[in-house]
Amino acid sequence: MAVIADPETAQGFRLAGLEGYGASSAEEAQSLLETLVERGGYALVAVDEALLSDPERAVERLMRGRDLPVLLPIAGLKEAFQGHDVEGYMRELVRKTIGFDIKL
């Protein structure tokens, strides 16, 4: 699993044991997202919606003809994780999205 968020939030994900990639602009986030999808190796890539200019269009365009990774735009990543259990939150979000629980 990979997470694209602002640099500070990405660092928090790395500290929690996930692969966090920091982006400071929509262009940087889009480039990272394209790179991660093309490179492969991830079943799930979560990205902070605030970093995408048009989240639905970005996901639709990148995933055309692909099954993996699952792209999961998430609103307010930074605010959601201040003082909370990052791993537990992501596990619950993944469970709701794909229908079963996984150990991150």
From Swiss-Prot:
Belongs to the V-ATPase F subunit family. InterPro entries: ATPase_V1-cplx_f_g_su, ATPase_V1-cplx_fsu_bac/arc, ATPase_V1_fsu_sf. Keywords: ATP synthesis, Hydrogen ion transport, Ion transport, Transport. Pfam families: ATP-synt_F. Produces ATP from ADP in the presence of a proton gradient across the membrane. HAMAP family: ATP_synth_F_arch. GO terms for biological process: proton motive force-driven plasma membrane ATP synthesis. This is V-type ATP synthase subunit F. It comes from Thermus thermophilus (strain ATCC BAA-163 / DSM 7039 / HB27). Gene3D superfamilies: 6.10.140.810, ATPase, V1 complex, subunit F. SUPFAM superfamilies: AtpF-like. GO terms for molecular function: ATP binding; proton-transporting ATP synthase activity, rotational mechanism; proton-transporting ATPase activity, rotational mechanism. The keyword Nucleus does not apply. The gene is atpF.
